[in-house]
Amino acid sequence: MIFDVHVHLVGMNPESGCYVSPTLSTGLIYYLFTWELGLAGVDQENVDEAYRDQLVTWAADSDLDGVGIFAFDGVYDDLGHYDHERTSYYVPNEFCFDVCEYSEKLFPVASVNPMRRDAFDELERVSEAGTVALKLLPNSQGVDPGDRRYEPFWRRVAELELPLITHTSFEHTVPALDQSFGKPEKLRPVLDQGVTVIAAHCAGSGVAHPFEEDFGTWLAMLEDHPNLWGDISAMASVSRFPYIHKVLQSELARERVVLGSDFPVPVAPMVFSPQLGWSKARELSQIENPLQQNLEVFRALGVDDGILHRGGELLRLPDGVGD
């Protein structure tokens, strides 16, 4: 099955338990977000439902067989208490599970910050509820994956056979508390506990950080860690487009990556005009469904079926799905 493992859920209505900081929910960022999704003019209290309905429609109308939908845990202090002041973005696991009930193509990816006091209890709860993986964005959630205090947590994640989809390298959208937490080498203690780790963006630092590269570290780590993978999310966007070429040029990388989009990050087909030609890039730009557009851009660039299908093989899908 063709599986996009990397799609973000957006919720802004406090009644759903979601939270987006004023930095992200006002001004230019919010305008561009709503305009890109066709949600301009939708009241913020109605954005949750409108975004959900768009996701359901786009997934149904795409060639994708499955889409991993992310919850997003908040920031926690050293005592394990939720830190609202430092949290920029929060999507509760329960909200994520509820949204995924609207389509058989949507699969919940829960988020559990290992710093929270009830981390083990929440991990067990979401595992029992059917999460197919866990999501972490260390830079913005204030989590150092290399901190050995969390090894028992990661050990339990491995026992539950839940893969971890974690952001790597620099974060560009959600305000970062510590960019060093995204370094791929920080994942070694997690990998050593036996967790299957999917490094989002293959640790590509992005065009904004051309002299601070982490992709090579991730690529080298593949040799030592058979449970380390990567996803190609955002590699069809302006921010990380050079990295799809790096992945496709490496036989090892091609064998260890899965499909992702990083939706709602916009796809930018025109940046691939030198490879695809202006006419083909323009044709891809006309695709209105962003999930399908991301898929078609990667197909045009030579992403093979192994990459497109591999994500579903790594996730802990319900029995009978994908058979």
Please report, for each region that a protein language model flagged, where it lies by residue.
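Short, flexible/disordered intra-domain loops and linkers
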Residues: Y19-P22, L37-E45, Y76-S88, T173-F181, ...
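H/E-rich (His + Asp/Glu) clusters that bind or coordinate divalent metals
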Residues: G204-D323
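Hydrophobic faces of well-ordered beta-strands that scaffold small-molecule active sites
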Residues: F3-V7, V67-I69, F107-A110, V132-L136, ...
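An N-terminally biased module of ancient metal coordination in phosphate/nucleic-acid-related enzymes
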Residues: M1-A71, Y76-T87, D305-D323
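Well-ordered, non-membrane alpha-helical segments in soluble/globular domains
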Residues: G41-L55, R86-D98, S180-E185, E212-W218, ...
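Active-site beta-loop-alpha junctions enriched in small/polar residues
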Residues: H8-V10, F72-G74, S111-M115, L137-Q141, ...
